[in-house]
Amino acid sequence: MKIAVLRERFEGESRVAATPETIAKYIALGAEVAVEKGAGEASRLSDDDFQKAGATIGATAAATLKGADIVLCVRRPAADELGGVNKGALLVGALDPYGNEKDVAALAKAGVAAMSMEFMPRITRAQVMDILSSQANLAGYQAVIEASKVFDRAMPMMMTAAGTVRPAKAFVMGAGVAGLQAIATAKRLGAVVSATDVRAAAGEQVESLGAKFIMTEALKDASGTGGYARELTKDEQAAQAELVAGH
């Protein structure tokens, strides 16, 4: 079985669909792995790193894909970029199908079976394949780091003989995976943190991280199924907007 790892072509995308560590595991299971030249450069992974793990380096996408049974990607490639794969080859990645029905149909027409990993169910057995949680965790961290750069002042309280710098106040909207990581990161940087969420159950998680939980009394609970929030009514949306604006 041949697994192909493509270089990402989406502007600004710095991730790669497999690392030398995971490739070594695929090879140990008996797979052949081909990585497109330069696929890991934006992630600071050289072609030599992949070769040391046992992968072959394809000079072009076509050479990498030739005879592939599985294609790994971060973002969905165009159907015409998948020439040379075996009929019925499996495309695995964050394929973003909603609103891109024509592109998905083109994949089907090309004879490719697509597996969109962002729809992996949130169940215990699938946790190790939950790409949303892992990426949201990083997004929450990065959001605070980027915000601190824009803020351009000290985040923690600083007391010196020359005076006192008061701590920054951080407000996090949403206490899902990304939000909770943002709260934890802001706290570690020394900010005074508060957060809001439409799910009452999120309050305990927010407070466990040392932040203040803010929730409007007009919205009792908007918890839906699978740990997600349900859609708010117009009145609930207005109440939530008023809460945020006044905080």
Model-derived features with residue positions:
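Short beta->alpha connector loops at strand-helix junctions that form conserved
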Residues: E36-K37, T60-A61, A94-D96, S116-P121, ...
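Residue-level detector of alpha-helix initiation sites
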Residues: R76, L138, G176-V177
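Short, hinge-like loop/turn segments at secondary-structure boundaries
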Residues: F50-G54, I131-Q135, A211-M215, L232
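Glycine/serine-rich phosphate-binding loop and adjoining beta1-alpha1 elements at the start
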Residues: K2, E8, A79-K169
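Short, charged, surface-exposed secondary-structure boundary motifs
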Residues: G67-D69, E101-A105, R125-V128, Q205-V206, ...
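An N-terminal-biased, well-structured beta-alpha scaffold segment characteristic
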Residues: M1-A106, A110
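Glycine-rich phosphate/diphosphate-binding loop of Rossmann-like nucleotide-binding domains
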Residues: L6-L45, A154-H247
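Electropositive, surface-exposed helix/loop patches at the edges of structured domains
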Residues: T60-G83, S148-M158, T233-H247
